[in-house]
């Protein structure tokens, strides 16, 4: 029996019901997206349960996954954590989760991975806080025969050092956001950008996708300022306050996540302007709070990035333990929600 140095950090007060399906399926155009059904989400969970059960039966013991989470930077991140923990809790007869909260520090994630290796977990899961600086610890995991799953963010390492990446196409998210912004401001005007954590793949790619699409397709739109808000509401507000002091003719704000957009909304209101009207708001993630803002007329569009990745994480881990091959990129399902869709979609938002 392998020793376990970490306990599963499950919050009993967080009911599993809060993880009912709330993602959306990407449509053929960037302007509409039909919400993914509860049945589809249930099918994903059921498939994961079947796969993990099969792995447990074959090996004669539980599937043990060590997961190093970034921290609690946003509502989206909390929803992802709950998805992982809830799946582990509900399938405790088949899986065991060792969970580490890195508090937004890479050194803490590296320490957690080393501990997972020492404890001999079957699979390591990681949402890397930044892209670089992982080569050595990934090599240590590889030497120990423990595959690594990257969840929702990529790492800048050789592909042979990790098994798969589960997550969204961040560049495409940025492109979709650019198209929505262009529609909202009539394809011309000055806009500002609130970037995510410096060095994080989500921030890098969402900026690349958005900026490249604006430059290529909308020559009359100018990004006049772009600065990191570190994916937090507080920093988003602070940076937006600075933007407003320096620029009086901002027509739109693009935020790499909803939390920064919500901070920007506060700053715009305090400046005596109307967010959603005087300044258009486009962001990424799809958390409940941004739907509330859209329903109130204070935001205009969110590109959803599905955080309910727990079932996919464990299904993929089970396949790896069983020696099965997996895709190098397991894509999650995302979509676009505009303000006119918010009121109808809001009752179904659980994160």
Annotate each PLM feature.
Residues 54-57, 61, 194, 198-202, ...:
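Hinge/cleft segment of the Venus flytrap/periplasmic-binding protein
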Residues 64-83, 87, 91, 98-115, ...:
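Extracytoplasmic "Venus flytrap"
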